[in-house]
A protein has these predicted regions:
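Nucleotide-state-sensitive switch-loop elements of NTP-binding domains
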Residues: 1-9
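General structural signal for secondary-structure boundaries
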Residues: 2, 69-70, 167
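NTP-binding/hydrolysis catalytic cores, primarily Walker-type P-loop NTPases
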Residues: 93, 99-172
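Intrinsic disorder/low-structure terminal segments
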Residues: 6, 18, 116-118
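Conserved P-loop NTPase nucleotide-binding/switch module
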Residues: 10-108
Length: 172
């Protein structure tokens, strides 16, 4: 049984959302269609170096499974995906969220993005003794220190959150 078959079977069950562990190929066509057909809150993962690269990979995977023109694929991706959460494995082998980006829409032949949060590393000389929940009071050697910084960009598509009765805090 392929992932494509599983996504199609899940669609027949009329779920509220669909979660696919990872898209690697033509099953991305079905995942995008599921996300575009009223399954808000659906989630999937993929591997790339940045949100822009993920969109490019997704376009390529969809092209492998269909004969749809690139413009139509980009429009469908832009309407299906709301947020991209980028994780990276850092030099200390930890995995961190390094970017949270809103997919704004399709304009001038491209999918437009709105970066909301970006991981900023703290310089080594600015990190002294770090308090950890476990009780360690000194910095672990070679550990990457940093945090997600709000970009200052406001979330553009707020109506979906409001429709779900969710409130945003602060200036986002």
């Amino acid at each position: 049984v392929s992932i494509r078959d599983l996504i199609k079977s899940a669609m027949r069950m009329r779920p509220d959302r669909i979660i696919v562990g990872e898209v690697r190929g033509v099953e991305s066509v079905d995942m995008i269609q599921a996300m575009s057909s009223g399954h808000d809150g659906s989630i999937s993962t993929g591997h790339s170096g940045s949100p822009e690269e993920m969109l490019s990979r997704l376009e390529t995977m969809v092209l492998m499974g269909t004969d749809i023109p690139l413009m139509a694929i980009r429009k469908q991706i832009a309407s299906a995906i709301d947020i991209i959460v980028q994780l990276e494995r850092l030099r200390d082998k930890s995995r961190r969220v390094t970017e949270i980006t809103e997919v704004v829409g399709y304009e001038d032949g491209e999918i437009r993005l709105n970066p909301l949060f970006i991981f900023k590393e703290v310089a080594e000389d600015k990190v002294e003794n770090v308090v950890r929940e476990e009780g360690c009071y000194e910095k672990i050697e070679d550990e990457v220190s940093g945090r997600l910084i709000y970009s200052g960009n406001r979330l553009i598509h707020r109506k979906k959150l409001e429709a779900a009765a969710l409130q945003l805090e602060g200036g986002l």
